Structure formats: structure tokens, C-alpha cells
Design a protein with these regions (language model features):
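Acidic, metal-coordinating catalytic segment for phosphate/diphosphate chemistry
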Residues: 1-17
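A short coil-to-beta-strand element that immediately follows conserved catalytic motifs
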Residues: 63-72
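Charged phosphate-binding loop/patch that engages nucleotide di/tri-phosphates or the phosphate backbone
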Residues: 128-148
């Protein structure tokens, strides 16, 4: 069971994302005009490190090595009138294997490598990455994103 609750006007949960960098580029997948990180909800009883490995395997079909936790984010936002409140763990990971052209999950979204120097030219989700990713050097950075 996913570690999330979905109501009529709200959604909250705990999720993980894989930050995969290679040759100065960030791995994302495209949903319409947005670029997202590989990741998803943690399962109840699952450690976040285990969850990011599972999500990478499910979405890309490759094994990954978890290097370190980069960001812990409390992300609150309104999406189409629905309040979202997510606790997010974003891990730096290295992929062991080739990235497919599309994700393997039901959406089969196109995978896209984005130049780290051009992040601001994309609608990246989560959006804090545009500012914070180029500044990150080491260690865990806590980020609190409130509703605007």
C-alpha cells in the first residue's frame, strides 16, 4: 500500500525521487510540457532508500546505486483546487544500465536528458530544482515550499 492519502479536496503522502546526472545533464521524463524526475510514493513499511531503487527499476527497468540523500522537501501546493502536501526525499543515484527511450510504467513517457546549465528553460517538477540543484555541493538540504 502506498504511503499516501487521497481525499476529495486533498492529497498527502511521502515520496522519493531519483536525481540522475550524467555528462552535465539531468535525467527527466516528459508529461505534456513538463519534465519530471523518476520517482513515486513510498510503500508503507518501506525505507526511502529502498523506495528509490524500486521506483527506478519499475520506471526505467534498470538497477541503480543510491549515492546520497540530497534534499528533504516539504512541498505544499494547490493543483486544480486540490491541496497537496508531500514529504519528499530526493536521492542522488547512479544508473547501472542504459536508460530506455520511454518509461516502462503505464504512461510510457519519453525520457529526456536536460543540460544542467539550461534548467531554467524547462518546466521542471519539482520546480525548486531549477534554483537548488546547481547550488548543491554535498550534504542534505532541507527545503520548505509553501502554498503561493
Amino acid at each position: 500500500m502506498d504511503f499516501r492519502v487521497i481525499g476529495d479536496t486533498y492529497r498527502y503522502g511521502v515520496r522519493v525521487s531519483a536525481i540522475v546526472e550524467k555528462d552535465g545533464k539531468l535525467l527527466t521524463y516528459k508529461v505534456e510540457d513538463q519534465n519530471h524526475l523518476v520517482g513515486g510514493a513510498i510503500l508503507v513499511g518501506e525505507a526511502s532508500r529502498e523506495a528509490v531503487v524500486r521506483e527506478v527499476k519499475e520506471e526505467l527497468g534498470v538497477v541503480c546505486e543510491v549515492e546520497e540523500l540530497m534534499f528533504v522537501v516539504e512541498n505544499r501546493f494547490d493543483y486544480k483546487g486540490e491541496l497537496h502536501h508531500m514529504i519528499e526525499f530526493h536521492y542522488k543515484v547512479t544508473l547501472i544500465g542504459e536508460v530506455p527511450s520511454h518509461t516502462l510504467d503505464e504512461g510510457k513517457y519519453e525520457c529526456e536528458w536536460i543540460d544542467l546549465q539550461r534548467l531554467s528553460e524547462y518546466d521542471i517538477r519539482p520546480q525548486y530544482l531549477i534554483k537548488e540543484l546547481p547550488l548543491w555541493k554535498a550534504g542534505i538540504k532541507q527545503i520548505d515550499i509553501g502554498i503561493e
